[in-house]
């Protein structure tokens, strides 16, 4: 039976993770109802109800929920909890590629909690919300909205008062900065991978181009589309995909090594088109909106002062940008780290662009994965 490309992507991601864990040959399809039995740790996925959730904008998101994935178990003191935020167009299944008994994120040692982003299609999103707030009527979501929901999950469901660490890649990294600004005093440390505390103007403009490419499809119909705006989604895909590697990375053909490998650039683009084409257009736009508004200073506690918010991150921080990231250049983290009280900047010297922070050989080199793992292990030893 054929799988749609979104499901195939999720299956492929999980297969890669399992192959790494068990050191067996990669297989293209996995029965997700059975693969959890093969994991050497306990895991579960569930919906956490937020009921009518008050947003930073003042609006209320009705019947809100987070889709939460947990790998590992809390110890008796609940001191081994790691919050692992999701990235743009990613999910808890994407994050699972970073787990392993020999990895820094070892679920036999830590309880790794992944709350999916709002607008991801997994937690409350334009595509899964009831009429009056569905599609283009879905409220605008900020990073702090996600952080407030996650804090409610951590404190009320798990009863955790002091999580050991908060980590995230890309949009997950931006969440890590936001979490640190609000909850650094009760958190062991944060690790933002390939992300900034504030979305730069250049990054904002790039994302705006991606948005307009999608919205230019006549079938988009201001978000009230009857069927997916395929041309717009393809235009979005081509725009966004261009940012994943820099000139040298694409010229060297590093993109052809992603996942199971591609014969040529066209097949790579076709794959990316199919993946983004399987994501709801309003969900994509919702995530982009959150990304564009990213700024840890945009909170009443900090009076729109980014430097003040950075100074309020009073827990240890390991900030790890990629040396070839077009979306979040390493140089943009330097002034941010300088404002933080206990932050270390460790650059991933890589050819693999933004995806170097994905922590998987499906996305980057083994050298990058080993380097990141080594530094996370060192950081965990420091804060434990």
Residue ranges and their predicted role:
Residues 343-384:
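Catalytic active-site module of serine/aspartate enzymes centered on a nucleophile-bearing elbow/loop
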Residues 313, 319-321:
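Short beta-strand/loop motif that positions the catalytic acidic residue
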Residues 306, 329-338:
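Short alpha-helix in the alpha/beta-hydrolase fold that links the catalytic acid
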Residues 7-29:
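N-terminal export signals
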Residues 23-42:
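C-terminal segment of N-terminal export signals and the immediately downstream linker at the start
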Residues 144-164:
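Conserved acidic catalytic loop of the alpha/beta-hydrolase fold
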Residues 69-131:
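N-terminal cap/lid subdomain of alpha/beta-hydrolase-fold enzymes
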Residues 186-188, 192-274:
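Alpha/beta-hydrolase-fold enzymes
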């Amino acid at each position: 039976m054929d799988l749609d490309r979104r499901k195939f992507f999720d299956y492929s991601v999980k297969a890669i993770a399992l192959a790494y864990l068990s050191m067996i040959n990669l297989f293209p399809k996995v029965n997700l109802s059975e693969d959890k039995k093969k994991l050497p740790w306990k895991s579960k996925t569930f919906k956490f109800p937020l009921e009518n959730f008050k947003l930073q904008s003042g609006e209320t998101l009705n019947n809100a929920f987070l889709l939460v994935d947990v790998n590992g178990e809390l110890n008796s003191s609940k001191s081994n909890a790691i919050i692992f935020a999701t990235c743009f167009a990613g999910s808890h299944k994407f994050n699972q590629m970073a787990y392993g008994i020999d990895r820094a994120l070892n679920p036999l040692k830590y309880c790794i909690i992944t709350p999916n982003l709002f607008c991801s299609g997994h937690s409350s999103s334009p595509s899964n919300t009831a009429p009056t707030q569905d599609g283009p009527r879905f409220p605008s979501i900020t990073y702090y909205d996600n952080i407030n929901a996650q804090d409610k999950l951590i404190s009320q469901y798990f009863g955790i008062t002091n999580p050991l660490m908060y980590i995230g890649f890309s949009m997950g990294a931006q969440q890590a900065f936001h979490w640190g600004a609000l909850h650094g005093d009760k958190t062991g440390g944060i690790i933002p991978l390939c992300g900034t505390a504030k979305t730069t103007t250049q990054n904002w403009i790039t994302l705006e181009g991606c948005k307009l490419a999608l919205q230019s499809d006549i079938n988009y119909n201001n978000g009230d589309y009857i069927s997916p705006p395929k041309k717009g989604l393809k235009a979005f895909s081509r725009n966004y995909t261009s940012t994943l590697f820099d000139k040298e990375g694409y010229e060297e053909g590093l993109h052809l090594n992603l996942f199971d490998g591609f014969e040529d650039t066209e097949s790579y683009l076709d794959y990316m088109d199919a993946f983004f084409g399987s994501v709801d257009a309003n969900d994509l736009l919702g995530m982009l909106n959150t990304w564009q508004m990213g700024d840890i200073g945009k909170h009443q506690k900090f009076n729109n002062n980014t430097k003040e918010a950075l100074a309020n991150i009073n827990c240890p921080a390991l900030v790890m940008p990629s040396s070839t990231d077009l979306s979040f250049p390493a140089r943009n983290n330097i002034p941010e780290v300088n404002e933080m009280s206990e932050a270390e900047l460790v650059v991933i010297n890589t050819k693999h662009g933004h995806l170097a922070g994905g922590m998987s050989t499906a996305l980057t080199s083994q050298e990058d994965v080993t380097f990141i793992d080594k530094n996370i292990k060192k950081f965990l030893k420091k804060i434990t």
